[in-house]
Amino acid sequence: MFTIKLLLFIVPLVISSRIDQDNSSFDSLSPEPKSRFAMLDDVKILANGLLQLGHGLKDFVHKTKGQINDIFQKLNIFDQSFYDLSLQTSEIKEEEKELRRTTYKLQVKNEEVKNMSLELNSKLESLLEEKILLQQKVKYLEEQLTNLIQNQPETPEHPEVTSLKTFVEKQDNSIKDLLQTVEDQYKQLNQQHSQIKEIENQLRRTSIQEPTEISLSSKPRAPRTTPFLQLNEIRNVKHDGIPAECTTIYNRGEHTSGMYAIRPSNSQVFHVYCDVISGSPWTLIQHRIDGSQNFNETWENYKYGFGRLDGEFWLGLEKIYSIVKQSNYVLRIELEDWKDNKHYIEYSFYLGNHETNYTLHLVAITGNVPNAIPENKDLVFSTWDHKAKGHFNCPEGYSGGWWWHDECGENNLNGKYNKPRAKSKPERRRGLSWKSQNGRLYSIKSTKMLIHPTDSESFE
């Protein structure tokens, strides 16, 4: 452009100068005939100007062509990005439709489960009432039979009485089987209801977070945990025949380890795992076997329980207190190290209520492993979000809630599960460990904490 402007400026000057020379010559000289061709100098100037103009135009064309190529490349990149974004938008819309369909199905299923749960509750209450009536009738018949036997000891039992007793026993067994079936179905419904609620919450969070702009990157989600103990509560069940403790269940003839419903005095009904050891029933309050359950939980979860009774779990401080306040109890701790060596120790103990932060006071009785828990001292329970005075960073340092004294010590059966066995001492201290004051440090693979009343007859 600059060259063109320069030529446009030079050419008029040359022409003007030439005209002036011609005029001056015309004035000073006699008229001469004009030449038919331009002067040689003028031709050279014009040729030089045109040459420069050509070079300038050539440079301009090359530069313009490069700019056009850059523009086309950017347009191609933009087209590809737009196409990719369109595909992602279509995929997101399809996923959203699928999520909405799934949400609708889950809502329908949830309503069905709710209706089934209400129906089962109604049936369960009616069955319990019928059982109470039948028990009263059986008791009345037994009293009549006793009177008949006492009044007529030498008279053989009447066939009708025998058949009546057999019929009543069969009815009672049938009702027991039916109640057990209803409780099993109730457990399954509770589990399904919890799973449906969890899926609904995930879908609700997904629908709330609908994208206002499309991003090509996504952030990973943090893993979730299941804080509260599943399959462990049945509320609003009113029946005096529910046992208060595992010993009662055992005394009624149930000699198999498993999950059972109990209702301690002045407490709600909940499920426990009754573990029969050498012909004696124990209530399992803690179990660690494989690290599948996170034990670095909050105070609320330690208070009411978490995990699964058929796996790793903590029964809950409030439930433990509701059991042990009924009588004097023994605490049994079973340990298994990574060499498959099994150890145990038993304590007589006292557990306070929530106002004392569930203070534990114990004395070792027997066992085949040295005691590692301070005796005759008030041990206060602490978690990372509920620390007792003097515990400072004990829950964080040991990755779980536990009973501590003034010092943290090196014992915590609710610590982090190290799998496989931790090599360094700091890692072993943060995990499941057991160490007496002057003894060796045991790195633990599995643990059980169980309780049993000292006076079993009081629960018959």
Curated annotation (Swiss-Prot):
This protein's GO cellular component annotations are: cell surface; collagen-containing extracellular matrix; early endosome; extracellular region; extracellular space; Golgi apparatus; lamellipodium
Induction (record text): Down-regulated by insulin.
One Pfam match, given by its short name, reads Fibrinogen_C
- Mutating L164F: what's the consequence? Associated with low plasma triglyceride level; fails to suppress LPL activity in vitro
Posttranslational modification: O-glycosylated at Thr-226 by GALNT2; blocks processing and activation by proprotein convertases.
Q: Give the GO molecular function terms.
A: enzyme inhibitor activity; growth factor activity; heparin binding; integrin binding; lipase binding; lipase inhibitor activity; phospholipase inhibitor activity
Instruction: Specify the protein name.
Output: Angiopoietin-related protein 3
Region Required for inhibition of LPL lipase activity: what ranges? 32-56
